[in-house]
């Protein structure tokens, strides 16, 4: 079973629908014992980084997430969840979880697209990602598949954590992390077949990791 973190700042319901469609057992929860007992945790998020961190700290779920990582249990951050897994976000001048090094930066509206026109902020819609290194999440997904993005800020971790990139005014990190600890800036639950495959890959990894223990 997968646990979808419930901290009043996420898109938990849409993630659950996607997992239900795949036939993957899941529960939306804020219960530390349920989270600890799950094969893996999905950490979704929408809205502002400051508000999301405030909810995590208020509920104590920030420490639950850190313990999840320290114990080596699988974690997948989505959108704002992806951003606040880093050390810091420029949005609301937010000190984040510090699970993965790096910061989250605002897109510069003066940047231009391939045609020389100023980009619109937020970055909203389908865009192609480019895989930079092998990743269990991307097994069976075309190397330059398109996913659905909605965000004004983008993650900027050190190069060694960058798994895939996307270009929107600048090349930015679309997936970061390492084995069992991943963060995706796009919304896999809204990304059609590639997104569903990514979620299925995460579940498979979690199940295999749990069976190996």
Curated annotation (Swiss-Prot):
Keywords: Amino-acid biosynthesis, Cytoplasm, Glutamine amidotransferase, Histidine biosynthesis, Hydrolase, Lyase
GO BP terms in the entry: L-histidine biosynthetic process
Keyword Metal-binding: no
Pathway stated in the Swiss-Prot or TrEMBL entry: Amino-acid biosynthesis; L-histidine biosynthesis; L-histidine from 5-phospho-alpha-D-ribose 1-diphosphate: step 5/9
Subcellular location as annotated: Cytoplasm
Reaction catalyzed: 5-[(5-phospho-1-deoxy-D-ribulos-1-ylimino)methylamino]-1-(5-phospho-beta-D-ribosyl)imidazole-4-carboxamide + L-glutamine = D-erythro-1-(imidazol-4-yl)glycerol 3-phosphate + 5-amino-1-(5-phospho-beta-D-ribosyl)imidazole-4-carboxamide + L-glutamate + H(+); L-glutamine + H2O = L-glutamate + NH4(+)
UniProt keyword annotation of Cytoplasm present: yes
Disulphide linkage map: none
Active site: 79, 187, 189
Glutamine amidotransferase type-1 domain residues: 1-212
Pfam families, per the entry: GATase
SUPFAM superfamilies: Class I glutamine amidotransferase-like
GO terms for MF: glutaminase activity; imidazoleglycerol-phosphate synthase activity; lyase activity
EC number: 4.3.2.10, 3.5.1.2
Main function: IGPS catalyzes the conversion of PRFAR and glutamine to IGP, AICAR and glutamate. The HisH subunit catalyzes the hydrolysis of glutamine to glutamate and ammonia as part of the synthesis of IGP and AICAR. The resulting ammonia molecule is channeled to the active site of HisF.
Subunit and partners: Heterodimer of HisH and HisF.
NCBIfam families, per database record: IMP_synth_hisH
Name of protein: Imidazole glycerol phosphate synthase subunit HisH
């Amino acid at each position: 079973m997968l646990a979808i973190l419930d901290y009043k700042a996420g898109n938990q319901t849409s993630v659950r629908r996607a997992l239900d469609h795949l036939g993957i057992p899941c529960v939306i929860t804020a219960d530390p014992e349920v989270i600890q007992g799950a094969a893996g945790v999905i950490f979704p998020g929408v809205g502002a980084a400051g508000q999301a961190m405030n909810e995590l700290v208020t509920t104590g779920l920030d420490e639950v997430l850190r313990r999840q990582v320290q114990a080596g249990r699988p974690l997948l951050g989505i959108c704002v969840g992806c951003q606040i897994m880093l050390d810091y976000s420029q949005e609301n001048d937010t000190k984040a979880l510090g699970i993965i090094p790096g910061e989250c930066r605002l897109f510069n509206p003066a940047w231009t697209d391939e045609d020389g026109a100023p980009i619109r902020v937020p970055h909203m819609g389908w865009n192609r990602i480019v895989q930079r290194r092998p990743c269990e999440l991307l097994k069976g997904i075309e190397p330059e598949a398109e996913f659905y993005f909605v965000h004004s800020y983008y993650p900027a971790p050190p190069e060694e954590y960058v798994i895939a990139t996307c270009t929107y005014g600048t090349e930015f990190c679309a997936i970061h992390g390492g084995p069992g600890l991943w963060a995706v800036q796009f919304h896999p639950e809204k990304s059609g077949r590639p997104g569903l495959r990514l979620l299925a890959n995460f579940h498979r990894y979690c199940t295999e990791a749990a069976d190996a223990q």
